[in-house]
């Protein structure tokens, strides 16, 4: 019973960490990363389709992404989708390839992005702590129903806390890495 709670807790904390990584990956650094365009949806015959399904995105150099569209007729639609995204990018097409130069980030913009990253990190930590609270509530319910002893409860809560601490540490590592990435360029 307790092992199931621990496994569920770990799975939910892992999902919270992955969600945080996904949110943070969308925050633009000065370096060209293909994942930057992952959230872009292109109008493909009347339906919104992810850019990744319609084109190949690669980092041409440190400041330029190259988007190779599979269907030539979609070049303008892809270019428009990139232009109208909230990323502030200005694509230019040459044949079947669209080049997306990334403007350098100002010091002020970097600081704003770091604040956003820290806010996302705090939300990630709150999500992890909520998972811990749910697990501890389940353990207390087992104690109340006399399915486990007080010693088992204390031991289980300590193990849940260790799992929580390890995931909070992982969140801090992800945040530190992103901040370093933002300030290095």
From Swiss-Prot:
Is the Protein biosynthesis keyword given for this protein? yes
May I have one GO cellular component term? cytosol
Compartments in which it is found: Cytoplasm
> Which portions of this protein are annotated as coiled-coil regions?
none
Entry keyword annotation includes Cytoplasm: yes
Q: Which UniProt keywords apply?
A: Cytoplasm, Protein biosynthesis
- GO annotation terms (biological process): cytoplasmic translational termination
Q: Which GO terms describe its molecular function?
A: ribosomal large subunit binding
| Taxonomic superkingdom | Bacteria
Question: Pfam families given for it?
Answer: RRF
Q: What is its biological role?
A: Responsible for the release of ribosomes from messenger RNA at the termination of protein biosynthesis. May increase the efficiency of translation by recycling ribosomes from one round of translation to another.
Q: Which HAMAP family match?
A: RRF
What NCBIfam families would the database entry show? frr (TIGR00496)
Spell out the family assignment given in the record's similarity comment: Belongs to the RRF family.
The identity of this protein, by name, is Ribosome-recycling factor
Query: Origin organism of this chain?
Result: Mannheimia succiniciproducens (strain KCTC 0769BP / MBEL55E)
